[in-house]
């Protein structure tokens, strides 16, 4: 049975991915920081949960030595594009330095494992109409936000690990996705509101009744 490790397992994607992989017969483990969401995993008997930070290299080494994954999904990140303007340092630290820690630990302790880091459509920036639909082989990466820059850097770093060390790397660039457990502040409703203005208030006629 293949062993899977998911970083950022308590996020929206991580939760559903873990459940899907478990149903397909994989042994699943994941890591996340000490948040209330971590209790979701502790209550699930089919998960092994490691609590810690991808910035902690010693923690990562202990996880890899303990679990020895065959497949790694790297989802842990500062994952909000717009908010990256208010958290540039955190975005670059987690998404670049943290990712480098994950790649290096995987290279050292599970060199034959496949690693799938979550890249992003934010790496493209604004795409001219004449380049739509996007072709991942020819559309240039021109990120315009700290988040987009951090993800482009992470992707190039992953390619470097593949080219220089022969690591098995798959690089999906994820576009906007919504679903159960998505944080309310990131829903399509909020995006619609930002695009078209606030929702009209509902006006009612007050009626008094005597019972």
Predicted regions and their residues:
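Conserved glycine-rich Rossmann-like NAD(P)H-binding loop of the short-chain dehydrogenase/reductase
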Residues: 26-35
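A conserved pocket-lining segment of Rossmann-fold NAD(P)-dependent short-chain dehydrogenase/reductase
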Residues: 84, 138-142, 169-184, 190-211
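Catalytic helix-loop patch of NAD(P)-dependent Rossmann-fold dehydrogenases
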Residues: 86-101, 114, 123-171, 182-186
């Amino acid at each position: 049975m293949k062993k899977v490790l998911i970083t950022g397992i308590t996020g929206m994607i991580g939760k559903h991915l873990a459940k899907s992989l478990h149903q397909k017969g994989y042994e699943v483990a994941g890591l996340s920081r000490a948040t209330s969401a971590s209790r979701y995993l502790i209550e699930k008997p089919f998960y092994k949960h490691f609590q810690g930070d991808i910035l902690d290299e010693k923690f990562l080494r202990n996880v890899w030595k303990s679990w020895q994954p065959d497949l790694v999904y790297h989802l842990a990140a500062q994952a909000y594009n717009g908010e990256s303007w208010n958290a540039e340092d955190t975005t670059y630290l987690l998404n670049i330095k943290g990712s480098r820690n994950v790649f290096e630990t995987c290279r050292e302790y599970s060199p034959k494992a496949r690693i799938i880091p979550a890249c992003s459509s934010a790496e493209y920036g604004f795409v001219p109409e004449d380049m739509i639909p996007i072709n991942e082989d020819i559309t240039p990466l021109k990120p315009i936000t700290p988040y987009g820059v951090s993800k482009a850097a992470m992707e190039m770093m992953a390619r470097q690990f593949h080219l220089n060390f022969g690591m098995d790397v798959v690089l999906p660039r994820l576009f906007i996705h919504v679903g159960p457990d998505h944080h309310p502040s990131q829903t399509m409703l909020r995006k619609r509101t930002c695009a078209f203005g606030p929702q009209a208030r509902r006006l009612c006629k007050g009626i008094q009744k005597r019972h």
